[in-house]
Regions:
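DUTPase catalytic domain/fold
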Residues: 1-147
Length: 147
């Protein structure tokens, strides 16, 4: 399934997101920085993509780490999963945190993260005095694995 998403380049050298294969869920986002940026160990750098998106209503853009960058270089989004709402029209910026012990340099046009467009449901939150009982109840943090 495909959906048209309008993209505005905020600088002429910015890269439009690309899919690695025909059926990839995540599209690669690229560094739109004019120069290389080095992310020192234990620090976070905000990497501009040079693009803005018009995500259709009913969809959300979810920003995830690229597995190779996270596993091989230790770079991943600082907020774990970034959320791009459909009414946001500003530049997409990825906060990359270096979890490794080595500096990592991001060159212009390097792939830095991936975006997945997904449908979502908004809730009509309803305050109540009591919640319906379930077998699980209040058990959490691994409680279902103790039976």
């Amino acid at each position: 399934m495909s959906q048209k998403v309008n993209i505005k380049k905020l600088n002429p050298d910015a890269c439009i997101p690309t899919y690695g294969t025909e059926i990839s869920a995540g599209a690669d986002l690229y560094s739109g920085m004019p120069e290389a940026v080095t992310v020192m160990p234990g620090t976070t750098e905000f990497i501009k993509t040079g693009i803005a998106m018009e995500i259709p209503a009913g969809l959300v853009g979810l920003i995830y780490a690229r597995s190779g960058m996270a596993c091989k270089k230790g770079l991943a989004p600082a907020n774990k999963v970034g959320v791009i709402d459909s009414d946001y029209r500003g530049e997409i910026i990825v906060a990359l945190h270096n979890h490794s012990d080595n500096p990592v340099t991001i060159e212009p046009k390097d792939r830095i993260a991936q975006i997945v467009l997904a449908p979502y449901i908004t809730a009509d939150f309803n305050e109540v005095e009591e919640l319906d009982d379930t077998e699980r109840g209040e058990g959490g943090f691994g409680s279902t694995g103790t039976k």
